Swiss-Prot record:
GO molecular function: alpha-glucoside transmembrane transporter activity; carbohydrate:proton symporter activity; maltose transmembrane transporter activity
Intracellular or extracellular location(s): Cell membrane
Protein name stated in the entry: Alpha-glucosides permease MPH3
Function recorded in the entry: High-affinity uptake of maltose and maltotriose. Also transports alpha-methylglucoside, glucose and turanose but not melezitose or trehalose.
Residue ranges, annotated region (Disordered): 582-602
Similarity remark: Belongs to the major facilitator superfamily. Sugar transporter (TC 2.A.1.1) family.
GO CC terms: cell periphery; fungal-type vacuole; membrane; plasma membrane
Ranges of biased composition (kind: Basic and acidic residues): 582-595
Cytoplasmic side: 1-106, 164-178, 222-234, 292-363, 419-426, 481-492, 547-602
Residue stretches spanning the membrane: 107-127, 143-163, 179-199, 201-221, 235-255, 271-291, 364-384, 398-418, 427-447, 460-480, 493-513, 526-546
Entry's Gene Ontology BP terms: alpha-glucoside transport; carbohydrate transport; maltose metabolic process
Chief location: membrane
Length: 602
């Protein structure tokens, strides 16, 4: 770690003589903080306090001054080290943090699985005959568009409620216990789905299961971003997208098996519901032993617990590990303190819209996640149903869905490689551009009724899935964790995910009307609509979405505070830890307040 040996030696010197402070002794009365020129040249930016040669112990004011600036120095050092840390070093230093993050994010496998089987049920013959109605014109059985819309609305409404409950729950008991409670309720609510005998029971079960799903959506992203360093942030936040895909792939495989072996048996839809009981218990046990987010602990003033939590995420032993823990805690303290000075209130949902800075951060986070719906990804979730309505056989529709999710997994892994060469914004925008082109081609093929055009539109939807999971799908999970301030991160992510859910409800209604033979019956021609909407999302990204690749949370805070435009985020360099020399007429009665105010002004 950069300058780590210096910091270890500096701390040893400080503890050996409590009267000695970083800097040079002068033969005059105590003066305000000055920066040592040689230290500047060394790149260490160590602030020191000048004092008289009196052998008496330093005054309480000087102690406070030194403590504050030591914390600021440590915060700066931790921030610089995090920004310059290579991937291999990060994995070697934070292996346990990565493992805990992967465990927590695995809860999203269940949400990806649960939401995917619902869309696949609409193409399952036994489900259609059990809960659907027969089309008088075609003689085919299908679930009515109104019920499809209703079931979608139920689980999304449940997610919205669950997300809103997540905020106060996290404030009260933290991330770990909130996730464990959500897993318990998910296992309990699954009984309703397994024993369903009507669409009404399925609607109730979906609404109740949606509440823990909403919790998973928020906390997996915020936990991954807070427990891991910058070098691992993209990989561990975008792993959430992989978990979604693993769940959807698992669902597609189970549904294909149900279509082949249980086409005329109630096990065709009961077995997929029952498999939801596999993960909650082992995941709850694992999360119980996971460390709490150090950011949450520092916000609660539980600094010793934050240090213990950080020790559990780091490898190695000895003074280097302890120094790294101290640096990180000091950085978190300084970051949160600077954010608190922007408002006198505790973090609440209203704070997300309180001033121009937070309004901008909230807007970008919400629209960024809403882009996952407006880019046409909801159509991918109904891919099996889409393939059927495009003229592909039921068996081939399920096969196409499996291929589609496999391509999505490969694309997400490819995005990890691409993130080394392209920024967050680049992947988001390029993905949208490619999807726009492919959607227009799908719409054009929908104007033809030949077998080749039907197979072509189905194949191109797989191309949409590939570009979606290469660009916008994974990168959104990283962006929404970086845009909010640390103090409002959980609440901003909740608002953003609920924005996504509301937009998804609208998009789902449109898709079901577009594909249902009793409604608009657009089929593949719906590609034109989603191509236009995807292009509009691309225009917003170009105008409003900042580039945050390579930026630490402290730097992002400073860039938003300075009002840097979206397209200049990448090139603008800031130093959030520069400390101004206070004016001569400043009061020395409260040195802590004066100095902290000076720091906050930066």
């Amino acid at each position: 770690m950069k300058n780590l040996s210096f910091l270890i030696n500096r701390r040893k010197e400080n503890t050996s003589d409590s009267n000695v402070y970083p800097g040079k002794a002068k033969s005059h009365e105590p003066s305000w903080i000055e920066m040592d020129d040689q230290t500047k040249k060394d790149g260490l930016d160590i602030v020191h306090v000048e004092f008289s040669p009196d052998t008496r112990a330093p005054s309480d004011s000087n102690k406070v001054i030194t403590e504050i600036f030591d914390a600021t120095e440590d915060a700066k050092e931790a921030d610089e080290s995090e920004r310059g840390m290579p991937l291999a070093t990060a994995l070697n230093t934070y292996p346990k943090a990565a493992a805990w993050s992967l465990l927590v994010s695995t809860t999203l496998i269940m949400e990806g699985y649960d939401t995917a089987i619902l869309g696949a049920f609409y193409a399952l013959p036994i489900f259609q005959r059990k809960f659907g109605s027969q089309n008088d014109k075609t003689g085919e059985w299908e679930i009515s568009a109104s019920w499809q819309i209703g079931l979608t609305l139920c689980y999304m409404a449940g997610e919205i409620v669950g997300l809103q409950l997540t905020g106060p729950s996290v404030d009260l008991v933290g991330n770990r216990y909130t996730l464990i409670i959500a897993l318990f309720f998910l296992a309990a609510f699954t009984f309703i789905l397994y024993f369903c005998n009507s669409l009404g029971m399925i609607a109730v079960g979906q609404a109740l299961c949606g509440m823990p799903w909403g919790c998973f959506q928020c906390l997996t992203v915020s936990y991954a971003s807070e427990i891991c360093p910058l070098a691992l942030r993209y990989y561990l936040t975008t792993y959430s997208n992989l978990c979604w895909l693993f769940g959807q792939l698992f669902a597609a495989g189970i549904m294909k098996n149900s279509q082949k072996k249980y086409a005329d048996s109630e096990l065709g839809y009961k077995l997929p519901f029952a498999l939801q009981w596999i993960l909650p218990v082992p995941l709850a046990l694992g999360i119980f032993f996971a460390p709490e987010s150090p950011w949450w602990l520092v916000k609660k003033g539980r600094f010793d617990e934050a240090r213990r939590s950080l020790r559990r995420t780091l490898s190695g032993k000895g003074p280097e590990k302890e120094i790294l823990v101290t640096l990180e805690v000091d950085k978190i303290k300084v970051t949160i303190d600077k954010e608190k000075r922007l408002t006198s209130k505790e973090g609440s949902y209203s704070d997300c819209f309180e001033d121009k800075i937070n309004r901008r951060r909230t807007r970008i986070t919400c629209l960024c996640w809403a882009g996952q719906a407006t880019c046409g990804s909801i159509l991918i979730g109904y891919s099996t149903y889409f393939y059927e309505k495009a003229g592909v056989s039921t068996e081939m529709s399920f096969t196409f869905s499996i291929i589609q999710y496999c391509l999505g997994i490969c694309a997400t892994f490819l995005s990890w490689w691409a993130s080394k060469y392209f920024g967050r914004y680049d992947l988001y925008a390029f993905g949208l551009a490619f999807q726009t082109i492919v959607f227009f081609i799908i719409g054009g093929l929908g104007c033809s009724s030949t077998h080749g055009s039907k197979m072509g539109s189905g194949s191109l939807l797989m191309a949409v899935a590939f570009f979606y999971n290469l660009g916008i799908a994974p990168v959104v999970f990283c962006l929404v964790s970086e845009m909010p301030s640390s103090r409002l991160r959980t609440k901003t992510i909740i608002l953003a995910r609920n924005t996504y859910n509301v937009v998804s409800i609208i998009c789902s209604v449109l898709i079901l009307y577009q594909l249902n033979s009793k409604k608009w019956n657009w089929g593949a021609k719906s590609g034109f609509f989603w191509g236009v909407l995807c292009f509009c999302t691309l225009i917003w990204a170009v105008v409003d979405l900042p580039e945050t690749a390579g930026k630490t949370f402290v730097e992002i805070n400073e860039l938003f505070k300075l009002g840097v435009s979206a397209r200049k985020f990448k090139s603008t360099k800031v130093d959030p830890f520069v400390v101004k020399t206070p004016p001569k007429d400043v009061s020395h009665n409260d040195p802590k307040g004066d100095i902290e105010a000076s720091i906050a002004e930066e």
